[in-house]
Every structure is written in structure tokens, then in C-alpha cells.
Amino acid sequence: NHRTDVRTINTSLLATDWYMDQMKRKAYKSDPILSNLTHKQYAFGNRDYIKYENLSDERWTLKKFMTWISSNEQRIKERRKYKYILEQYGYKKEDLENVPLFTQNMIYYPTNKLRFYVNKENVIKSGIINPSEIDKIVDYIDIDIPKSGLYKNQILMLDILSKNDWERPIYFTGGSYKDSEYIWMKDYLQLDGLVYKLVPIKTPINEKNPYQMGRIEPNRMYDIVKKWEWGNSESSDIYHDPETRKNSISFRGNLHRLA
């Protein structure tokens, strides 16, 4: 029972152009991943890292942010270069000659505050949440991205999120607790078995136990875990290495949360 309609994305490899090219092609029954960025825009040497420049407290929509990053409009292309910022700080032509061209051409973003609106119709249509919980759906999710900069794989994660618009469920495998691994939306997760689904229902992280992320929808979770198959763990012929023991503790912890 393999789900060939599901697309698995290795977010570390998103930093490579060849991998993103693969994601944008249909594979088996899995539709392509949609993106605002063209191959040329995420090819090696382009948007490998973009810098934060604190110019505004305005909260941009995620779509506006991606337009800023991806637009081919000449006016935007010139204004988003770090060279433009240096000129606003009073740099003259002769001053810029001492600034590496790479730095001058680096893209910056003027605010780290983003807003991701929830398409409630798509949320229900795609089965992301139970229709009985429609009253819990938020209108938007506020995302605070780093005040340092973004690497290419992080840009593309935001890109995929924006373009998807809640048409396909998005899951995270867990195993990491870094905010960036969940696109800075750890308060909007739902534990489904061993994975975390992005849902438009806020569940704040418990500060006393920050490793227990996400809400649980009991009926769905119960249905999932009842399909798990176990065996041979009790055998004395099986060596349980440290990683295996860690995984078994995670499984037990998830079952404990359901109980």
C-alpha cells in the first residue's frame, strides 16, 4: 500500500537547483510542486542567501513577499538589490567600488513579518481538517522569519507554501524542533501518527513541555495507529541500537499523547 500520489520533499536538498527541478515534475501519481520561482531564479549562485534589512514594521502578505523575491519587474528588481540600500545610506559611485559586486546584487527583504491567509474553502475541500471543526479555523497565520537572512531552501519552502494555497495537505516528518523546519508555524500543527500536519487551527506550544508539538484529532489519530504493525521487538535475537531505541520512545510518546 504505497501512496504514489504523495510527494516527499527533502528540505535540505531544496538548496540545490536540480532537486527543485525534480519537484516541479510529475512523479508517478504525484502532481508537480508549484513554484513562483523559475529555474534561472533559483539556479546555483542565485538567491543562495537573502539578507534582512530592518526598514519596515509592516506585516506583508506571503504573496507580496514572494512577489518581492521573484518579480521580473525592473523597478522591483532594482529596489530589492542591497546596492539600493547602500545608495540610500549615502554611498556614492566611488564608495560602491569598494563593495563586492556579490554584496551589491544580493536581494534583501525589508520586513520579517509575514501573514499567510487561510483559504477556508480549499482547507475543507482538501480534507485538511474535519468539517465539524470549521469554527476553529483562523483567518490567517502570522509568520516571523529570521532577522538575519534566509537560505535558498527556506525561500523555496515559503514559495511552496504560498503557491499551494491549502490545496494539498502539507506534513512535516518531525525529528527536529527548529522553528525553520516547520516554516516558523509550530503553533499550527496536528500530530497524525508519526507526522505533523499543517492545520489552520492554533495550538500554542506548551512551554513546560515544548517537545510535545501540535494538537491531536483523537478519532483520526486512533484510526491511524490501529493500522500500525508491530513484531519481533521482544526477540532476544534482535539488537536494538541507540537510534532504534530513540525511535521506539517516540512511538510510545505519541501513543501516550493519544491515550
Predicted regions and their residues:
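ER/secretory pathway lumenal C-terminal domains and tails of membrane proteins involved
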Residues: 2-258
